[in-house]
Amino acid sequence: MELKEGKKNDYRRKLGEIWPELTAFLDQEKVHNFSIWNCDSLIFGYYETDENHEFSEEKKNQIQALTAKIEDTFTWISTPGENMRLMYHNFGVVRENKELIRHRMFMTKLKPGCEEEYKARHDGLVAAREGKIDPGPDSNFSIWSAGGY
């Protein structure tokens, strides 16, 4: 999402207003590792579900109703409800203590027409690892694409 000019405080206030309803929904649907972060006026959200989880039409309608309460503060830069595309991964050591994991986020905007080349190059890096687990501190690293970012 991209915040509309001058709407950052409105977005934060409205998100706070729907937060109890949103977190209750996430708990009910067994959504975990939910996070929201921003880079300037861009807002990204992330969550995980069990592998074969799909939201029912009723649940999708609930999501749309919650979104409608804050939608006047942003425009979509990706397709609502569509998963981000995994561009690269190095999922390595599963850490018992999640507090030790470094959480970092960076963002870049791909030049038009470069997404497939970017993906192909990173697929080559994944193939070169030949399935070996990286024990280093930066394992469990992934790159996702949402709306060209």
Enumerate the predicted regions with their spans.
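Long, contiguous hydrophobic alpha-helical segments, chiefly transmembrane helices and signal peptides
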Residues: I43-G45, F106-L110, Y118, H122
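Intrinsically disordered, low-complexity acidic/polar segments
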Residues: K8, G45, E54-F55
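Short amphipathic alpha-helical segments
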Residues: K7-E29, C114-P137
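An amphipathic, aromatic/His-enriched active-site/gating alpha helix that lines ligand/cofactor pockets
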Residues: F25-H32, T49-N83, D134-D138
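Short glycine-/aliphatic-rich beta-strand segments at the starts of folded cytosolic domains
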Residues: M1-R12, L100-E116
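Intrinsically disordered, low-complexity linker/propeptide segments enriched in Ser/Thr/Gly/Pro
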Residues: M1, Y11-K14, F141-I143, Y149
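Glycine-rich beta-strand-turn "strand-cap" elements at beta-sheet edges
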Residues: F34-S41, Q64-I101, W144-G147
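Short, glycine- and small/hydrophobic-rich beta-strand elements in well-ordered beta-sheets
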Residues: T23-T49, E130-Y149
